[in-house]
Amino acid sequence: MASLNVNIAKDTKISETVIKNIHALVLMNRPDDKGVYRKIPVTIMGAYTEPVQPYMIKPKITELLIKNEKRKKKMHAIERIARFHLEFEGIHPFIDGNGRCGRLLLNFELIQNGYPAINVKFTDRKNTTKPSMSSIKITLHSR
């Protein structure tokens, strides 16, 4: 994926438009799919949960955005950003590019909150992401 330099305004909130615009950049070579929520059910190999049905994507994204704003007052930024990322990936709103879009959204929030962007190399993802996501899910569900 091409690198992307963006000046992130402090007051820019993640919105459905921002999510779809970031996704459009991720899938710029697939005009029919870029920035468009999926219209078919999907399953993710090795996932513990199934993504929401297509008709629930928009309401779930709206709910996630509202929760994210409320959490800004209650949670440490890192915990809030991690939860947002986990829940976004669980919704799996697009037919392709969810992981890339989710990582860009995660970095958008990190930078906006004064943290450096992160990059998990593709070769490291298999070894770090699955165990980390499993422990995060266990932690979130035990609260």
Question: What are these regions, as identified by a protein language model?
Answer:
Residues 1-96, 100-143:
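FIC/Doc superfamily catalytic core
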